[in-house]
């Protein structure tokens, strides 16, 4: 069974979807949580290259058709606004990619994630930023939820199209991928600590 999506095949939005996740958000807010981050593992299947929300082995490229990058940005803006309007939950952060550098995600549909190259990430983030500015959304776009801290400053188990993320996204010399002056993109980078927090002697 596929995960529910607010966006429907006819282009309309069904705000009765994803009740379980939204209930968790409301319960968290009631209990004092005051910062919220939205994330996703895939663009809507209507926009993907394979019609699925999982990778099917494109050598780690983004599962998003070239003609749907702007549609993807518009979808994210609509969801950010829609959840705030319907549930009074304001997302402080949006993480549009999950472990894009994960080498395990290049082969096939073995685990959720958003395989992508840094150029694909930069293109998408610039368009998301543009849409957020147009719609007056101040949610910050975080990048890039690395699968391993080491991918941020090396090519650990990945390659140059995906590694060295700090340098690539925040050094002005990285012309194709620089996001340091992009509206709504804070000067921070996110990642997961798998394999780097144990054993302690490492």
List where the protein language model places each region:
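Solvent-exposed loop/turn segments at secondary-structure junctions
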Residues: 42-46, 97-103, 146-150, 193-197
């Amino acid at each position: 069974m596929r995960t529910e999506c607010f966006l429907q095949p006819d282009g309309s939005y069904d705000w009765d979807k994803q009740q379980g996740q939204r209930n968790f958000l409301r319960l968290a807010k009631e209990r004092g949580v005051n910062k919220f981050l939205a994330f996703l593992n895939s663009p809507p299947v209507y926009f993907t290259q394979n019609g699925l929300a999982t990778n099917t082995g494109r050598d780690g490229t983004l599962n998003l058709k070239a003609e749907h990058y702007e549609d993807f940005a518009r979808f994210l803006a609509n969801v950010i606004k829609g959840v705030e309007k319907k549930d009074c939950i304001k997302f402080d952060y949006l993480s549009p990619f999950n472990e894009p550098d994960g080498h395990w995600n290049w082969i096939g549909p073995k685990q959720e994630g958003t395989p992508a190259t840094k150029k694909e990430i930069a293109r998408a983030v610039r368009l998301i930023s543009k849409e957020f500015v147009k719609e007056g959304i101040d949610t910050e776009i975080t990048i890039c939820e690395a699968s391993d801290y080491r991918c941020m400053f090396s090519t650990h188990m990945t390659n140059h199209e995906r590694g060295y993320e700090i340098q690539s996204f925040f050094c002005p010399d990285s012309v194709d991928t620089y996001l340091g002056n992009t509206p709504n993109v804070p000067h921070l980078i996110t990642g997961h600590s798998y394999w780097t927090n144990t054993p302690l002697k490492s």
